[in-house]
Regions:
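Well-ordered beta-strand segments characteristic of repetitive beta-sheet solenoids
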Residues: 49-50, 72
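Beta-strand cores of secreted/periplasmic/IMS beta-sandwich domains, seen most often
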Residues: 59-77, 101-113
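Extracellular/periplasmic metallocenter environments
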Residues: 23-35, 41, 48, 55, ...
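Beta-strand signatures of extracellular beta-sandwich domains
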Residues: 80-84
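Glycine-centered loop/turn positions within well-structured domains
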Residues: 54, 79
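Short, well-ordered turn and helix-capping elements at secondary-structure junctions
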Residues: 51-53, 60, 85-87, 99
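Surface-exposed loop/edge segments in extracytoplasmic proteins
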Residues: 87-93
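Sec-dependent bacterial lipoprotein signal peptides
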Residues: 1-24
Length: 133
């Protein structure tokens, strides 16, 4: 009886520790990391992107040049949104399932590729474009 009670406490401790680690790793917003500085001023437009099981919806978006906001809403797991080719250094949105993350960004005219940088997600189709005019 005493031995079973001890095992329960050990199991509870392991589960509690694992929950803490997973929660810390998969927390809500990524906030763009420490190297990214958001532009000041109001956003002209908010580009909303839903990240799901290996997809972005919409796959492509249009935005005006200047300060815009990008919002990632995640469903079905942890997802990120970064710009390919280092075009926006340090910018990173990260959201766990059912959560969202949002940052402002100052984009010049052009076509930007975005993708999820979680291993295997981009290769499985989690890539899109933002066209700025």
């Amino acid at each position: 009886m005493e031995r079973e009670r001890g095992r329960r406490w050990i199991r509870a401790g392991v589960i509690g520790f694992a929950t803490t680690v997973v929660t810390a790793a998969c927390g809500g917003g990524g906030g763009g990391g420490s190297s990214y500085k958001q532009p000041s001023g109001p956003a002209q437009k908010t580009i909303e992107v839903k990240g799901g099981n290996f997809f972005y919806d919409p796959k492509s978006s249009d935005a005006p040049a200047g300060v815009d906001a990008i919002k990632l809403e995640s469903e079905g797991g942890l997802h990120t949104l970064v710009f390919a080719g280092g075009k926006v250094p340090g910018f990173k949105l990260q959201a766990a399932s059912g959560k969202s993350d949002e940052l402002k960004v100052n984009l010049k005219p052009g076509k930007y590729t975005i993708y999820c940088d979680i291993p295997g997600h981009r290769e499985a189709g989690m890539e899109g474009t933002i066209t700025v005019t």
